[in-house]
Amino acid sequence: MRSHYCGDVNKSHVGQEVTLVGWVNRSRDLGGVVFLDLRDREGLVQVVYDPDLPEVFNVASTLRAEFCVQVKGVVRARPDSQVNAQMKTGEIEVLGKELTIINSSEPLPLSLDNYQNNSEEQRLKYRYLDLRRPEMAQRLMFRAKVTSAVRRFLDSNGFLDIETPILTKATPEGARDYLVPSRTYKGQFFALPQSPQLFKQLLMMSGFDRYYQIVKCFRDEDLRADRQPEFTQIDIETSFMTSEQVMAKTEEMMRGLFLEMLNVDLGEFPRMTYNEAMRRFGSDKPDLRNPLELVDVADLLKEVEFAVFSGPANDEEGRVAALRIPGGASLSRKQIDDYTKFVGIYGAKGLAWMKLNDLTQGLEGIQSPVLKFLNEGIVNEIISRTGAQTGDIILFGADNATVVAESMGALRLKAGEDFNLLEGQWRPLWVVDFPMFEKINGSFHAVHHPFTAPRGVTPQELEANPANRVSDAYDMVLNGCELGGGSVRIHNQEMQSAVFRILGITDEEAKEKFGFLLEALRYGTPPHAGLAFGLDRIIMLMTGASSIRDVMAFPKTTTAACPLTNAPGFANPQQLAELGISVVKAAKTED
């Protein structure tokens, strides 16, 4: 039905007859000549119909936006005065000779031109219309090119694309599982995989030493701008490769991807330990475009008569951190109060501050509600450590270390945006040396997942002192987003059992949930390591989209619903009976 895509017609086709199909983007009658912009996935082209062909002209006069049509005509160059440099096809136009209306269109329930006026609900309900917008089409085409480039790289490096099961067994990986009831085994359930983690490890045990898969994963968790109930991973696993080799290979892939797709050379990725990232930036995925850093000052404040500072300063689990904002002395009291409310979201009880109005006047040139508790030596040392100057403000977070990191790390990002401090477009890094475990409510939890190997300890040493052990794990971070995370895996049954015990998983529970893995670890398991990238997040960053929903064809809402299909929906009674399921309706509450 077509000879060319609309967006591909150019000056080399002048004088040629072309057949185009697509949608009417805009139609206008100017002085007896009908101009229409015809659109397909590759772009727009202007088609002109004049009254010399009255039958065709009359049909062209009836066209409205989003009519699906076929056009036959001859390509001609536009006069210099009519060249449109804003259009890919702006040097030419097509003189229409034939016109077929394939399908008409009713008035659209949403605007494709002023899409900002469309609600998120509208855009998702009529997603097939929203995807006609060039911006959306270009993102999905970009995504297709990225996955093609990833496959090409991995294929050429000896990786095998192997599928793993979608219907599997529930395993504790951090989020809630989506469960699928079994008809043949009443009362039993499959789980949709949160990742192919265990299956790809089993593939390593099977001898397939380089595996990859671009795979759907499912997590029933609270949603944010960068979360969806179903998402896509670039999943990679290797045998007989160290963490350094895995990092080198995947960094090579990512650098090549950015060079090919965006003509951007990311350069060599720097390394940063988890502890350094948390200390300097309050985050294990720091945005290095932001020059602001947290500075520890607790050692200066142990003896001050201000419990807000001295309490955390003398607490082993406490922290007092200072954040210098260049030019921040211009902040009004209301703006400081807004920052105080902001850190409160992350558990902070308040925000102390110090405005450096004129350092040539000593303490007289400093404005701060906490200045009366600090002597000149302490103030000067804080100014020296933070590198603050006249016109700056220093903000203080004082609490347990976790609250300080989360609240001041978030404030660092906000202040960097508010004061336009971001430097450079792309700042990648590797974060390494993560702790093996974190303690939550008195119990140990895996920082990555239960199959991550510790670095340089025996199972006995790990169980004797789990709190201070480092894992052989690594995260790739770009502009404050975690692109992917991975680790060396445990390939020894004794070590795996030790980790389960530390996590409070009894031997009986481990056998019930992970018996197949523990069994497999008995039969010559090779050392193996891997990494998984979040494809949706990578595309979001590369295209500048504000949400991963804008780089997925048919995403869910923030409440995990699909307005297009009205999913999820109720099952009919017959289906439920076959599955042995009865639905318990919530009891009505009286006012």
From Swiss-Prot:
Keywords associated with the record: Aminoacyl-tRNA synthetase, ATP-binding, Cytoplasm, Ligase, Nucleotide-binding, Protein biosynthesis
Catalytic reaction(s) noted: tRNA(Asp) + L-aspartate + ATP = L-aspartyl-tRNA(Asp) + AMP + diphosphate
Region (Aspartate): 197-200
GO cellular component assignments: cytoplasm
PROSITE patterns in the record: AA_TRNA_LIGASE_II
Function, as annotated: Catalyzes the attachment of L-aspartate to tRNA(Asp) in a two-step reaction: L-aspartate is first activated by ATP to form Asp-AMP and then transferred to the acceptor end of tRNA(Asp).
Subunit structure: Homodimer.
Protein name: Aspartate--tRNA ligase
